[in-house]
Amino acid sequence: MKLLFAASECGPYIKTGGLADVIAALPKSLHGMGEDIRVVLPKYRGIPEDYRERMAHVGETRVRVGWREQYCGIESLVEDGVTIYFIDNEYYFGRDGIYGYMDDGERFSFFNRAVLELLPVIDFQPDVLHCHDWHTAMIPLLLEDVYRHDPYYAGIRTVFTIHNLLYQGVFPYEVLVDLLGIHSRHFTAEGVEYYGNVNFMKAGIVYADHVTTVSPTYASEIQTGYYGYGLDGLLSAQGSRLSGIVNGIDTKSYNPATDSHIAMKYRSGLNKKTQNKIALQEELNLPVAPHIPLMSMVTRLVDSKGLDLVIRILDELLYYDEIQFVVLGTGDPSYEHWFREAANRYPNKMSAQIRFNEPLSRRFYAGSDLFLMPSKFEPCGISQLIAMRYGSVPIVRETGGLNDTVHAYNEYTGEGNGFSFKDYNAHDMMNTIRRATAIYRQPEHWRKVSKNALGGDYSWNVSAKEYQEIYQQITKSHA
């Protein structure tokens, strides 16, 4: 089967969040299963020079944006058997950063059309075009409206994946008709209209052949008012057209047995993990105390990550409990300031690394006993999967993908790979942390829960098969 992924970011070329991790890893798994899969991205200024030097010029075309035709260069490179195409246009993508520009509606309108105009140039007719988040969500509608009479595009089916419903791509009406060239008949409540504007995310949901999101729990949550951000009614109406498939991680990249960034490589031995803990305590200038539970967070310092809960309980936890706490991340300046101040108050119990450093994050995962992730909402979450891959036992709130991937430890059966609490409540979180540290002090139970976490399959293999089934289903139903 021929597959094309269209997305706004992909690691390691350009990344702002978990979307880039998915686009980097899922195509590799599908390629390993025998699929002819390719990926198309914008060629941003921020792509590192070493990748730019490897790109080959494939061709060029012109893309209509309103009354103008814009240059569209096409470059490519091959990574692990997957061809990555880059759409080159200096006016739209030769800027710092990726998002947040006043003309994002125009920039990504260009990109949506460029993805389709690219296909004849590279002589590739995908069976399925898989679009990700609002940045590529107009592609199914373009196929339905602008390209419907062109036989080259007739057989293409579409899948649309919602990675985060919070960001929907809402722009004025003119983007639809004047820039994209889509007929105004689609500007209805049943189409793309959203409170007098055009909603890209809504277009993907309405016009794709199948809609997925990144965990079964999140698929249920977004059908409610609290998580649906105005689209809950539409999503509730999708029925079997909406699926939730949990993300995986790249287990070759995240592998404690081969990771050169950690102090001591290990497969399953908790003794070697203890050596990583000691090395992390030394690196962060904390007292070396292998018997004390070390809890970590690797996170963006933003509201959605549950940091207000952490702030409410941290003084009590560090003052009364025998525990060390380390945090790594950047974000809201008020959170950055608070965590710095807390680390100053408890220099023997806490370290706040207000930066992001990928090698250091690996050492956090390898060196910590517990990994705290009390998110307000979490469509899937990848950090908890990486933590478990490195044997750091997660403490999570039961939301989104956290609920699907972390299962509370049962002392009687020995089952479970972490600890969890349901309500968004600081008191409940504190009780869960204290239960986890109590289990930590019971070696027999701690070995079980740690090995359960360390021994799980967090690869993309199972999820990739689920996507394969959807691709086969929508191509057969239209055959």
Identify what each model region corresponds to.
Residues M1-A479:
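Catalytic cores of nucleotide-sugar-dependent glycosyltransferases that transfer UDP/GDP/TDP-activated
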